[in-house]
Amino acid sequence: MPIFLSLYISNMSRSIWGPATWYLLHCMVLKIDDNIQRPVLEDLKNMIYIVISNLPCPMCSNHAVSYFGAHQYTRISTLEQLRFFIYSFHEDVNKRLKKTSALSYAEHVLYYQPFNLSMVIKNVIQIYENMNNTNVTMMMYSFHRRRMVSDLDQYFRKHASLYRA
């Protein structure tokens, strides 16, 4: 895909899908039970990877996947490590976008804790389902995003009892 098309699509709606996706990622790791078992942690990590691999901006997804690989995402073995990883990832993206973040790790936990998880999920699903792509290449990405939304729904149905609203 031409770089200008990717930039146009990413800038066109990043202000909408970007914050919604960050709320989702932070809430996924902060609102889950602190005592989850290893298989649940792996499910969570897999779902997060699916989300970042299917962002509405292919260039953003490529950066995210590269970051996860370079920072050994697969080696994360505790929930606390995963929580800090998502925080650090968000900070890295903010730096790359020349945005300033005034939140320490502890402040970010306090910031995201009050969010209503079911509303965050509904918002993400609504945003991702309502993106229209007319370009053939972008339609392929749209297909994968729809699959991601379905996977996300299944993930939360399976693990609903482990999450605080």
Predicted features by range, described:
Residues M1-A165:
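Aromatic-rich, lipid-facing transmembrane alpha helices and their immediate juxtamembrane interface loops
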